Amino acid sequence: MVDFLPKVTEINPPSEGNDGEDNIKPLSSGSEQRPLKEEGQQGGRRHHRRLSSMHEYFDPFSNAEVYYGPITDPRKQSKIHRLNRTRTMSVFNKVSDFKNGMKDYTLKRRGSEDDSFLSSQGNRRFYIDNVDLALDELLASEDTDKNHQITIEDTGPKVIKVGTANSNGFKHVNVRGTYMLSNLLQELTIAKSFGRHQIFLDEARINENPVDRLSRLITTQFWTSLTRRVDLYNIAEIARDSKIDTPGAKNPRIYVPYNCPEQYEFYIQASQMNPSLKLEVEYLPKDITAEYVKSLNDTPGLLALAMEEHVNPSTGERSLVGYPYAVPGGRFNELYGWDSYLMALGLIESNKVDVARGMVEHFIFEIDHYSKILNANRSYYLCRSQPPFLTDMALLVFEKIGGKNNPNAIQLLKRAFRAAIKEYKEVWMSSPRLDSLTGLSCYHSDGIGIPPETEPDHFDTILLPYAEKYNVTLEKLRYLYNEGMIKEPKLDAFFLHDRAVRESGHDTTYRFEGVCAYLATIDLNSLLYKYEKDIAFVIKEYFGNEYKDENDGTVTDSEHWEELAELRKTRINKYMWDEDSGFFFYYNTKLKCRTSYESATTFWSLWAGLATEEQAKITVEKALPQLEMLGGLVACTEKSRGPISIDRPIRQWDYPFGWAPHQILAWKGLSAYGYQQVATRLAYRWLYMITKSFVDYNGMVVEKYDVTRGTDPHRVDAEYGNQGADFKGVATEGFGWVNTSYLLGLKYMNNHARRALAACSPPLPFFNSLKPSEKKLYYL
């Protein structure tokens, strides 16, 4: 039996006139060769105990917790364990001696994986002796732009030699190409995070079909990384806020509704358990006004969410624990409004209904205690809502947890719809959001001053003329304006509309700038139409066709809500539908005129089911060609966005960017009206773009994409950049609604399309290669 550890080798960049073979050298172990026995292990032979093969070898695509867990660590296995007898592994994992012996062939820099006769179809297993050193030398060789990622923009040799497990690391094979090398970097980074110093690594894990790899990571890793659940030990960390940098924001802080004493005591206990965390706990008043919310800007905090009682099965001790929820990712580390709905779709698809159900519970809690579904659960969002999706979300969770056959599911559905009806009446059908003349609703949040969660310089171009007018610095002007010490009606109007834009979820876009609070939009009114239809259905099916509102005492039946839906549909057609263009436009309630901004939100009318068959046909024929790009639907047309300049910078919710919510709702809406082939075509475009970025850019999955770029669609230079792009070594979260879009988009793909995506076949060449009968599947 060997008594030392094998080594990994790398290839250095070739010198002139040398293609690289002479530059191969072993990675140094960083220490003297050392015994492969557990520390403290006694010498001498033990009787061999036969172990099952399942105990020894795992699915190469196991979760990281299993794959890099202690049971696969050679240093933690007994001397008799096969993982600690690497020389004998060839008995179980045969690799051709011919292949292993052929090391004297020329290494070439290629952009693809090694598909030569020396390849073994991903069945090989590697042995890496020193994970830290392997990481350092891999990055030194391949990460030429020094961003801790291996991408197509790096100019390294794109090849490395890795020792095989069967040969105890003495024989080597090549790992080639950006995709495999970046996957190797990711796996080494993950292994290091688990404290591993040595690993066995299946080639199949770094040469995995990229479509399978991404969907697997979303389901098994990304959702886990994005899931939060408040308990006594993590609340201080969850409460921290990277968006606010003021002295009062240094300490984590939690605000609790005035009528939740049990939660208040829970958080006090958490603060006392670890005083060094400096967790501050405060009650909110019964009446929350815009003035009060502004007063919290210097001392922002997390808002309490729904909790349930947990009983320790061992001790019988009772304690509170938060329902689970998912956060979008990046700088967004809270429970967001419409992000949560879109993530719930993916969570349900991934059989993680407990998290989706938890978010329904949180929305019920928010409506009950904060009067609305919040933009997110931070104190500075108390006056601001987001696009309402609760009814559809509750119905999806209801069906997933047993539907009408589960009494608990029925109770959850009823509670969710009581909350949704309250939200409908008190938020969307009340002043200032309801326009009494048209009967349609607008995004129109309350608030005073400058939104504190924005970047410090976000509004500098707007504020600079006022700073010059008062002869003060921008910082001083912000203070004077927020404190009401200067009065500027135009600035007040600007921030009124800016807050409305943020409530819309589309922050920011030129279609809303300076007018949002006055616009009756097709997106919001489509959602409210869906609320009315869903409420009518649930009242009929689960309330005995009679619903008594506990807040205002009114009694309604399903017919009442159907009438409301039909009335809204009539008003939408009157004020928004434009047959000539095939778009539902927005209606300016102040100027009493229809806008002409061509937006992808026109497809929300199909998702909600309010468009007629003829309107859907016209939308597909006229509006769709204006919005369909290389990578799917663009947020708006270039014509509507207008010219871009230093004084008129690009906005992230405008051309040329595409967003997952627009794709998801359009796919479902088109399918509902018989245009599933169109949805399939759009889905292929969107999935191609995500897959290409994932393959070429170190497993990157980002918040939004430039749907006009074929090479680097993840590169978005607008406003605060692109969440999900800034990571070292490995991306562990993706981005919430993009994760969902990938899983849902794959449901439209047949095997042929999945193979094309895995090969990163661009949409047009792929579509052109199809047979006439196959083109029909994509409405071509």
UniProtKB/Swiss-Prot annotation:
Q: What is its EC number?
A: 3.2.1.28
What GO biological process terms are annotated to this protein in UniProt?
Answer: trehalose catabolic process
| Residues the entry annotates as binding substrate | 331, 338-339, 375, 384-386, 505
Q: Pfam families from the entry?
A: Trehalase, Trehalase_Ca-bi
Which keywords does this Swiss-Prot/TrEMBL entry list?
A: Glycosidase, Hydrolase, Phosphoprotein
Q: Which residues form the active site?
A: 507 (proton donor/acceptor), 703 (proton donor/acceptor)
Q: Which reaction does it catalyse?
A: alpha,alpha-trehalose + H2O = alpha-D-glucose + beta-D-glucose
Q: At which residues is Phosphothreonine found?
A: 88
Any one Gene Ontology cellular component term annotated for this protein = mitochondrion
Task: Provide the positions where the record notes the PTM Phosphoserine.
Answer: 52-53, 112
A molecular function annotated in GO for this UniProt entry is:
alpha,alpha-trehalase activity
Renumbered to this chain, the signal peptide range is none
Q: Where is the region Disordered?
A: 1-48
Q: What else is known?
A: Present with 2500 molecules/cell in log phase SD medium.
Homology family: Belongs to the glycosyl hydrolase 37 family.
Q: What is this protein called?
A: Probable trehalase
